[in-house]
């Protein structure tokens, strides 16, 4: 483990017009309670924004990525972090040991040699290794933050364009970043502890409260992680869905349980529900598992589209006037097990703009109807879908929970 870090209003509601006015300047944007938010819609834009965030840092950089690859993009970002250290910026980088398993630890030696701090989540080889930290964020000077579903790897930055991941990022500037700085500090202390005790991690997730949070404010950070019930971020989505009039969702991995499926169907009966899901992925079982669920949803009026342009890695939920952007998928792992970060923004103008964004993704997708779904559902296809759902939606989830929750005091 590398060295530990040193210890050390007026509401401006966005309107649809304000959000659209930022489209030509690199994405949808708004100002809210002294915070500026900007949506980054393209892979090259994500990489450019991350580089600019690092190069613009004056005092500190704090990064966590599930995957940090040793490819061209990984070397570029690592080089920028080393350059930041050379100009006196304190740099801390954490990665997930499972997600970044293909990247040798010595790849990060230049950062440690430059005086940066480096740690791996889940480095201890035990059943705890099955618990993954799926969060992705970069914080500069505790005032600017870039988050979303993307990792540090060529595929997420549009390289190559014909087979990349289509993802989303959100740049946040303002006082709301302090909450994630606080969470990052807790996470670094846990990663820096030799034992990386599971009980401590569960307590962190269960007890985390956003510092200085205004319960009536429009912005709220929600954390996900391994608890005995639905993950905290998913509990909030559940609460919104139970009262939802309209639901629009873009999900890279979709295999929720029956309760969530019923809530989606209920929204469809009210004002409508639309899902944009992948037509292809790095793991074909995840696509097949999602397709097993299409029939019951289509029968209940849910609109389903499969994205065609490239692989889909986006995590975006719009429930009435609330928008969720972050790292969490809508599968059993993200709903119950993985550490996740989502930002919930409640603003009618922002929600409308993000629905417009989803409209554009729908135009790049193929709509699945009940007729086309039934026409493609042969017996071999159905067997494949059931096996895939068993593996993705049941076995992985069940085994991980039983190994790690068999004794809440065990480590």
PLM region descriptions:
Residues 2, 6-411:
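Charged, low-complexity intrinsically disordered terminal segments
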């Amino acid at each position: 483990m590398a060295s530990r870090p040193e210890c050390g209003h007026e509401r401006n509601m966005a309107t649809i017009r304000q959000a659209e006015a930022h489209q030509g300047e690199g994405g949808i944007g708004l100002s809210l309670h002294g915070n500026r938010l900007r949506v980054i819609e393209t892979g090259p834009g994500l990489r450019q924004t991350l580089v600019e965030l690092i190069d613009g840092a004056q005092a500190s950089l704090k990064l966590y990525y599930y995957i940090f690859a040793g490819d061209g993009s990984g070397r570029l970002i690592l080089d920028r972090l080393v350059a930041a250290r050379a100009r006196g910026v304190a740099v801390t980088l954490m990665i997930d040991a499972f997600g970044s398993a293909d990247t040798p630890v010595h790849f990060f030696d230049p950062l440690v040699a430059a005086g940066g701090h480096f740690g791996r989540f889940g480095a201890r080889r035990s059943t705890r290794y099955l618990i993954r930290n799926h969060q992705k964020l970069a914080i500069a000077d505790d005032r600017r933050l870039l988050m979303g579903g993307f990792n540090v790897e060529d595929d997420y930055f549009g390289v190559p364009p014909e087979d990349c991941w289509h993802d989303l990022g959100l740049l946040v500037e303002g006082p709301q970043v302090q909450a994630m700085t606080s969470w990052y500090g807790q996470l670094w202390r846990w990663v820096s502890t030799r034992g990386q005790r599971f009980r401590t991690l569960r307590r962190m997730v269960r007890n985390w409260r956003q510092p200085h949070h205004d319960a009536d404010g429009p912005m709220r950070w929600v954390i996900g992680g391994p608890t005995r019930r639905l993950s905290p971020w998913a509990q909030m989505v559940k609460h919104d869905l139970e009262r939802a009039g309209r639901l629009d969702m873009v999900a890279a991995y979709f295999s929720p349980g029956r309760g969530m499926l019923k809530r989606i169907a209920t929204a469809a009966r009210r004002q409508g529900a639309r899902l944009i899901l992948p037509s292809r992925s790095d793991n074909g079982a995840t696509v097949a598992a999602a397709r097993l669920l299409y029939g019951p949803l289509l029968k209940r009026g849910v609109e389903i589209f499969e994205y065609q342009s490239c692989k889909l890695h986006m995590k975006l939920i719009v429930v009435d006037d609330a928008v969720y952007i972050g790292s969490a998928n809508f599968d059993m792992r993200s709903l119950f097990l993985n550490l996740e970060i989502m930002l919930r923004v409640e603003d009618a103008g922002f929600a409308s703009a993000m629905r417009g964004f989803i409209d554009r993704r729908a135009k790049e997708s193929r709509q699945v109807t009940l007729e086309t779904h039934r026409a493609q559902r042969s017996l071999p296809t159905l067997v494949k879908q059931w096996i895939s759902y068993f593996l993705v939606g049941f076995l992985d989830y069940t085994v991980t929970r039983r190994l790690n929750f068999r004794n809440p005091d065990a480590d």
